[in-house]
Every structure is written in C-alpha cells, then in structure tokens.
A protein has these predicted regions:
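Structured secondary-structure scaffolds
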Residues: 2-39, 43-46, 98-102, 147-318
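Anion (oxyanion) recognition and catalysis
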Residues: 36, 82, 111
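Short, charge-patterned binding micro-sites
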Residues: 48-54
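A glycine-rich phosphate-binding loop feature that marks nucleotide/adenosyl-phosphate handling sites
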Residues: 51, 123-129, 295-301
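A charged helix-plus-loop insertion that forms the helical arch/lid used to bind
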Residues: 58-71
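A glycine-rich helix N-cap at a beta->alpha junction
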Residues: 73-89
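Feature captures the FAD/FMN-dependent oxidoreductase FAD-binding
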Residues: 95-115, 125
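Cys/His-rich short segments
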Residues: 113-171
Length: 318
C-alpha cells in the first residue's frame, strides 16, 4: 500500500470562512478520496493558523480576548467542513502545545546552528501581509500596491533567518524539479522571485511590545515567532516531526515528504516556494525530502445586478 500525504493551507480565523477556503478544502478532499479508492494509505491534513497580528487586531476591534476569538472562529471552519463532508485525517491548530513545542525546538536548533541572528531594521511594513517590505516591492509609480494593504514605517530590532544563504540551492531545486511545483507554468514565477531571496534574509520574530499573540522565541523571550514561520511548520509538526513515541501522530519518516501541498496562487511566493523549502533545508531535509506544491487559482463571483466579476474571497459561507 502506497502512502499519500496531502495538506491544505491552514486558514486564518480572524473572520468567517468564505468560498475560497471551501474551494481549496473540497479540491483536496476530492484528491484524497480518489487516492483512497486507489488503495493508497492517505493522510489528509488541514487546520487553522491562529496566531499573528491580524488576529490580535480583530480581537481588539471586537473587544474580546484573542484566544476567545480564535476558538470561536475556528468552530465556524470546523462546522463548514462537516457540512460540506470534507473528510480530513489530521487537524492542525497552531495554538496546540505539540505544535508550540515543535516550533520552539526548531527555532532553538537553528539558533544553535547560527542560522538565526539579531539586527535592527528601519523601513516599511505591510500590516495585511505581516511582512517587511523593500524598495523592490514598490510599483512602477513608486508606491506600494493594493496587495500590501496598510503600509507603515517601523524601526525595531528583530531576529532573522539566513534565507539568502539558501537562494542558490533553491534555484537549483526549482530548476531540477527537486521542489515540485504544479502546474508547471508556476515554476517561472518562483524562479523570478528567487532573486529577491538571494538579497534579503527573513525576519522571523515580532517584538512583544507590538505583538503578544504568538509562539515565544525560546532563546529571547521578548519576541514571538513571525506568523508564517510558525504556520508553515504545521505541515511537519502535525505529521509527527519531533514527536515522542507515545504520540498519536503518524510516523513522520514514513509519511514525509508531502505528495501535495494544496495552496492558492497568492501564497506560492514567497511563503511556500521560498521560505518553506529554505526552512526545510536549514533543518537538514535533503532534496529528495522536498514536498510538491499544487497551486490553484481563485474563484470569481459574477454579480447578477451588474454582470461584473470580483474576487470571491469575501463571499461568506455558513
């Protein structure tokens, strides 16, 4: 019996689930069902990304505790997957203690290996994307595009991952197919993005005086982990990576690598095609242990009254 490990992106429960969330989960569920019918041993992992600045901001706006917000909205996602008959085998929630332990263990190892360093930063920051920006992120008109949302100026000290050290390897992995990317035409998009990775390291922390809702750095308690660094690790933390023998999680060595990370085109670059493979390599994963990225597009909703189309990401579902 062949194993088949399929994941989806974990959803951000700062709001209600929408058609984009549903499309991705149903797509992954169809693939998982097909593989089960073929006789494969399937492990289908999905879940929620409960940390980060947007969660903290939404909780503040609603006047509720952020943990309460995370629990309340997570229930909405679970209820929808039950309603749609999505049959997953593993559930990832980033506030789970086993995930926290795994993330902190990885951070400690990378810190000990010299893959993380601390430096001061002064520049621009996208609140929507929760990431720092460079001049290359400006449009031809000299402004930051709408995709970045609110952009503010920041000056603060943070911890960084030596992403740039892995850029040449990443280019080779994408070109050779060691990092699988489907459909094939998405590969060119990734290769174009690697140039920036060769020049910029990844900020993997946020100071607690600005963001308290996250996983604390084990070697510097004044900081929490950047939400993407935290979230990406769910693909291995809930698949048994670094778990003890008494754990009910799968056998990681048998399960990994993932046969399909099902993700939207908006989070291919930089998160899944730049950050994630470089993180894996820094952890000691080899070329033949890299996952396959299965990238889907978006739904457009046609308005009956105007005939115009808009992104379906705001079409709420219940």
């Amino acid at each position: 019996m062949n194993k088949f490990f399929i994941t989806t992106a974990i959803d951000y429960p700062n709001g209600s689930p929408h058609i984009g969330h549903a499309y991705e989960k149903v797509l992954a569920d169809i693939i998982a069902r097909y593989r089960r019918l073929r006789g494969d041993e399937v492990f289908f992992l999905t879940g929620v990304d409960q940390h980060g600045q947007k969660m903290q901001q939404t909780a503040d706006q609603e006047g509720v505790n952020v943990a309460t917000l995370a629990t309340r909205n997570t229930r909405k996602f679970i209820a929808l997957w039950e309603k749609l008959g999505v049959h997953y085998d593993g559930w990832a929630a980033t506030t789970d203690e086993l995930h926290k332990k795994c993330v902190q263990g990885i951070l400690a190892t990378l810190h000990d290996q010299g893959q993380l360093y601390k430096k001061a930063y002064k520049g621009f920051y996208s609140v929507r994307q929760e990431q720092y920006l460079t001049e290359k992120d400006r449009g031809e008109d000299g402004h930051f595009g709408e995709e970045w949302g609110e952009v503010i100026e920041l000056e603060e000290e943070n911890w960084y991952f030596r992403l740039s050290e892995h850029a040449e390897w990443l280019k080779s992995a994408v070109t050779s197919g060691a990092l699988g990317i489907l459909p094939e035409f998405r590969r060119a998009e990734v290769l174009n993005a690697i140039e920036r990775a060769s020049e910029t390291d990844l900020c993997i922390s946020r100071p607690k005086d600005r963001l308290h809702w996250g996983i604390e750095l084990p070697f510097d308690t004044g900081f929490v982990t950047y939400v993407w660094f935290d979230a990406l690790i769910n693909y291995i933390s809930f698949a048994g990576y670094r778990s003890d023998e008494s754990s009910s999680l799968p056998d990681f060595d048998t399960l990994w690598p993932a046969n399909a990370h099902v993700i939207g085109k908006d989070i291919l670059v930089p998160a899944h095609a730049i950050y994630w493979p470089c993180m894996l390599r820094a952890m000691g994963f080899t070329d033949d242990q890299m996952p396959i990225l299965l990238v889907h597009g978006w739904w457009n909703i046609r308005k009956k009254n105007t005939g115009s189309e808009e992104d379906g990401s705001e079409e709420k579902m219940s």
